Amino acid sequence: MELLNGKIKPIYFKYLSASFGTALIASVYSIVDVAMVGQYQGPEGTAALAVVAPLWNIIYSLGLLVGIGGSVLFSARRGGGRGDGSENQYFTAAAIGAVILAALAWAGIWCFEGPILTFFGADESLLALAQRYMQPIKPVFPLFLLNQLLAGFLRNDGNPGLATMSVLAGGIFNVFGDYFFVFPCDMGVYGAGLATAIGSGISFLVMLIHFVGRKNTLRLVRPERLGEKLRAISVTGFSTFFVDVAMGILTVLFNRQIMRWLGSDAMAVYGPIIQISTFAQCCAYSVGQASQPIISMNYGAAKAGRIRQTLRLALYTVAFFSIFWTALSLACPNFYIRIFMSPTPAILAIAPAIIRTYALSFPLLPLNIFSTYYFQAIMKPGAAFIVSVARGLVVSGVLILALPAVLGANALWLAMPITELLVAIYTVAAMKKYTKTLPATGDRL
């Protein structure tokens, strides 16, 4: 197999180029929507989509839970060389789990949309805009979860290019559809939601092509001990799931704290910050998703040297993204603001300090996120759990709540830089420990 015997460097960059596109599936839709709505509706539109942002984190994180969890086990089982097709039991179990989660999420958004958006920080004026945006998205809401599931398994089934093509097809439509529906059709925020909904459907249909192609080895089979496999998928995928859902939790905490301590102008600035952070986070996803199939399969085959080669390339890539996003954010903060809205003078006055302070989290954010993929791929879900929960809830949550009360309102923006620093200390120590003890022989599943 290519992943077990081919040269690591070309394989890694082949998968990186593909996974970079698929990892942006979350940000392409939301970033274009925020930019178009911000230009059409102004700061109020940007703030309304900041309220919706946690919904994206939730639905994508559920897709990552089953998509990454299932595909890691799929590749590790295949790398173990059994040759009996048993890896497809994990594909089937992941598909069943995805359908269940999609149905629950779909029911929740139809039945409790208003209370959910209010809890996420919407006041009366923002709630109406947020609900208008969600109106065309609700009928296809499960597709956003299923797209993540399929992308994960396509990468691990040797077809990362099709996963990328699906994102490009849906994303390109979304870009032009956003403009067409929002401005020429004068649909405003509803048009942005409509373009996003259609784009997700296009991505889904493109990925289905894999199942009629020659590369496809994915099969629906009867899984033995389904409950045990769903549990294994959940444990393996939990850390990646929590990285994304935690961003939603943090967005809710930030929304509520911003409205309490700083007001609506700061909330309008936070909308672009979410998009910048999502982009930086998706770059880290791409490194993790490129590395994971290679590392998982070679872990199953106990080829420690190939794992270390892949890790080295991944860390170089992580360093590049860290430098890029930090430098861009520090150099031209108001560039982001002008992309995402037609700003008022008051917003242009406060935005540079806010964005530059928050951007101090970007040097270490990609490393911490990548580490969760690495720990999962070498079957160390405990370490991945510690990183994701500390970063996504425990350390960050405490700082978001405590800093403005102790040091003043503007200290709120220091919460994420401090969080990333503290978590990175553990990440580096754990990565060194587990990399030194990689197995050289044997089957790890």
Residue ranges and their predicted role:
Residues L3-Y40, P54-G69, L73, V99-W106, ...:
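N-terminal transmembrane alpha-helices
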Residues K14-D33, P136, N147, G170, ...:
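Transmembrane helical elements of multi-pass membrane transporters/channels
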